[in-house]
Amino acid sequence: MHDIRAIRENPEAFDRDLERRGLAPLSAELIALDDVRKGAVSAAQAAQERRNALSKEIGAAKKAKDEARATELMAEVARLKEEAPGLEAAQGEAAKALDERLAAIPNRPKDDVPPGADEHGNVEYRRFDSSRERLTQGRQHFELGEATGLMDFEAAAKLSGSRFVVLKGQLARLERALGQFMLDLHTGEHGYTEVVPPVLVREEAMFGTAQLPKFRDDQFAAGENFWLIPTAEVPLTNLVRESILAEDELPLRFTALTPCFRAEAGAAGRDTRGMLRQHQFNKVELVSITAPEKSAEEHERMLACAEAVLQKLDLTYRVMTLCTGDMGFASQKTYDIEVWVPGQQTYREISSCSVCGEFQARRMNARYRAKEGRGVGFVHTLNGSGVAVGRALIAVMENYQNPDGSVTIPSALQPYMGGLTRIEGPKN
């Protein structure tokens, strides 16, 4: 959500930032809507002030025994009372029109975000190479999984349709191990507090993190006013909704392992085989709530925490700074971590870490009280995958595959697998 006062103070800067996003100028339209709102507020206030003044005049007229004047004034009060609901409605409608327009506009990119229309404009930030030799060929994860019978898309399709999977046996245990490993790392070494949140949330929570209203078609509704979460970012960030925190409480750092649900409305024809793009998947999420001056530093810290997962798994990856045309709706700046996937001979996104500034905080009314009497302001919010568990499973399977179809268990995961060192390939 944008601050209309900031737009009024510097409309040219606002329009320049929208242009970087590929959008037309909107400041004039927004200021016009705000003028209507201000006019409605002024009209309602003027009517109330007139009623207050009339009450005093009526008292004076009665005291002077001027009944004719008192009757005239009371008639005007009655008229103003009759008009009041309409003035209040006009005020509410004007405020709603402005808020709805502001809510539909994406966040303003930071100055250092590279320009670009789509993913081709993204810029490599850094990379990490595994200590193991990179595989230049190999089977894809679904070929490995189906050959062992431990990854069953056919059974999932009978249960739920396309873009679902059933994992069994040691592969199911490996996915569970990955999630537990990530949580232990983030809570034990990175200072995050583990949370087990609801996966059904109200519409207000989805609005707060900006999944709604713009991305309604990408979500799964569940009954009246409930939505399945597309990411734990939604409940974790909304933990500070409608609250005023003390600056000494910041930063807050939350992590959660949850199932996530996405309709993938715009993904027709993409990644139709395998686990890369599912309607339901598990993900470890990281969320930070900070004071404004600390959010840039926290963004780099969060990125390093997500990277640590892949480094400990000894997986090759690169970090990309997303360009203005590829970053998310609520983001000021985003880093994507892309892991090497030998079966496709390419890098695929496994984590996205974003700083949102006060964009989500304004939608949630999440504030903090600054020290030394500096007043109350909006917090900054950050979110990142720490990481997507299903995609981590893909990366482990494909990067640790052996010629016989078996998969070596990374040493970091072996304690979570009861000491198991490999998942056997198909029996001949």
UniProtKB/Swiss-Prot annotation:
Please describe what this protein does: Catalyzes the attachment of serine to tRNA(Ser). Is also able to aminoacylate tRNA(Sec) with serine, to form the misacylated tRNA L-seryl-tRNA(Sec), which will be further converted into selenocysteinyl-tRNA(Sec).
Q: Got a GO cellular component term for this one? A: cytoplasm
Record's protein name: Serine--tRNA ligase
> What quaternary arrangement does the UniProt entry report?
Homodimer. The tRNA molecule binds across the dimer.
- Where is it located? Cytoplasm
Q: Which reaction does it catalyse?
A: tRNA(Ser) + L-serine + ATP = L-seryl-tRNA(Ser) + AMP + diphosphate + H(+); tRNA(Sec) + L-serine + ATP = L-seryl-tRNA(Sec) + AMP + diphosphate + H(+)
> What CDD domains is this protein classified in?
SerRS_core
EC numbers for this chain: 6.1.1.11
Instruction: Give this protein's Gene Ontology molecular function annotations.
Output: ATP binding; serine-tRNA ligase activity
Q: Which organism is it from?
A: Methylorubrum extorquens (strain CM4 / NCIMB 13688) (Methylobacterium extorquens)
The UniProt annotation places L-serine binding at: 231-233, 285, 385
User: From which residue to which does the signal peptide run?
Assistant: none
What gene name is given for the protein in this entry? serS
Biological process terms in GO annotation: selenocysteine biosynthetic process; seryl-tRNA aminoacylation
Instruction: Tell me the Gene3D superfamilies matching this sequence.
Output: Bira Bifunctional Protein, Domain 2 (3.30.930.10), Serine-tRNA synthetase, tRNA binding domain (1.10.287.40)
